[in-house]
C-alpha cells in the first residue's frame, strides 16, 4: 500500500521590493509566491498507521493518503491495478461533494507518476513531472495572478535553476534553494533595468550590481534588498559618484547623501 498526497496549495511566502535611488524610484516587484514546504511522503510500501484508502464509489479503484478527512472522495477515469489507480487518466478530488483538485496525467500504484497537470480550486495549476506523488522534475506552476514559475522541482519544491515571471513582465532567472530565491540570479525589469548578483531567502543579499534604466548603477554589497556595506553608486544625471560604506540603504559624505533601497525620509535626510 502506498501513499498519495491530497490537495497541496501553494502559499504566498513574501513580497520582494526592488531597490530605489534618489534620482528615480523603482517600481515594486509585488508579491512573488513560492510554494510552501510540503510534507515528506513515507517510504513506499511502509505507510503510517494513520493512512486511509479513498476509493471511487463507482469503480472501487482508489488511492491511499495520510490522515484522510471523512468527507473526501474521488472519481478516477483510468485503469486500476490491485485496486489502485494506474496509467493515464483523470483524478478528481471532492470535499463534501464539492470538486477541489483535479489531476490529469499518469499514475502508478495510486501515486502521481510521470507527466501530469494538477489544477487547484483557485485556478492555479502545475504542469510537469511527478514522482512518487510529488512534483518532481521539470515543471511550471501558474499562479491565479498569471505569474509563472518554471523550475526543477524536488519533493514538491523548486530546487536548482529556474525562472519566475511576474504578471507585469519582470522576471527572475537564477537559483532556488529551500523554497526561496537563494544563490546567484538576475532580475530583469520591463523598463530595461536589472539586478545581477546574490540572493538569500528571496532578497538581494551579498554582492550585486543594480542598473537603472536611466544609466544609474550601484555595485557593491547588499543586505535585505538595500545597499549595505562597501559599494559605489554612479551614473546619475548629476554625474556624482558615491563610494564608501552604506547602512540600510543610506549613504552620507559631508554634505552629500544618497539612497539605494531606502528613502530619504527613512534615512533621516529629510
Task: Name the predicted role of every residue range.
Residues 5-6, 17-270:
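Intrinsically disordered, low-complexity repeat tracts enriched in Gly/Pro/Ser/Thr and acidic residues
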